[in-house]
């Protein structure tokens, strides 16, 4: 709620074939240590992304998700915005070999939000991402998705953006294996004079 995790609004984070942790709770010995910030750092070349670097250094929370087997239902990250607030969130998703997951994101999260999502897809893995941004006239958002897609892995992401004063969505994909695939799509709808939207994709 307003960029702060709410246990009251969340389901139990334990589930079969899924390991979910919060960035705010983990220590140095967590599996994410070897992955956190790796793709963001690589994504600074050939174009600097200072907001992404700021996020990696300053993120207060985020979801650390490791998919280890069959997942029967999607994972939802829901943002609830009640009061003026700022949020810096960093998510990390690792999908193991031949595993698949669908991740849903919905809600404005905060008045000003900076998010990074790093997605590691092992051989034959599949990741489907559907995101709804809005409907919030006062939102300022900078989002970044970085993904490493290995052999025969599939990455799909769709974003629907409604309103917002300023929205910038970046997607940086590395196709690092044969016969891998990536599909990125989106739609934007703005109502009002103060509306600026920008999508950028690097492969």
Locations of regions flagged by a protein language model:
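Conserved beta-strand/loop scaffold segments within soluble protein domains that form the structured core
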Residues: 8, 12-19, 23-26, 31-203
């Amino acid at each position: 709620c307003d960029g702060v995790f709410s246990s009251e609004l969340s389901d139990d984070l334990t589930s079969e074939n899924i390991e979910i942790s919060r960035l705010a709770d983990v220590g140095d010995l967590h599996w994410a240590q070897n992955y956190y910030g790796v793709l963001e750092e690589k994504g600074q070349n050939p174009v600097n992304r200072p907001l992404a670097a700021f996020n990696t250094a300053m993120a207060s929370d985020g979801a650390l998700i490791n998919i280890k087997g069959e997942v029967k239902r999607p994972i939802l990250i829901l943002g609830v915005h009640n009061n003026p607030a700022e949020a810096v969130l960093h998510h990390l998703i690792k999908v193991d070999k031949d595993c698949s997951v669908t991740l849903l994101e919905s809600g404005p999260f905060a008045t000003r939000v900076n998010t990074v999502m790093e997605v590691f897809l092992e051989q034959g893995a599949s990741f489907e991402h559907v995101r709804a941004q809005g409907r919030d006239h006062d939102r300022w958002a900078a989002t970044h998705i970085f993904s490493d897609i290995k052999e025969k892995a599939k990455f799909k992401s769709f974003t629907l953006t409604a309103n917002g004063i300023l929205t910038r969505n970046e997607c940086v994909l590395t196709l690092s294996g044969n016969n891998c695939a990536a599909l990125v799509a989106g739609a934007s709808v703005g109502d009002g004079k103060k509306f600026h939207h920008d999508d950028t994709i690097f492969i």
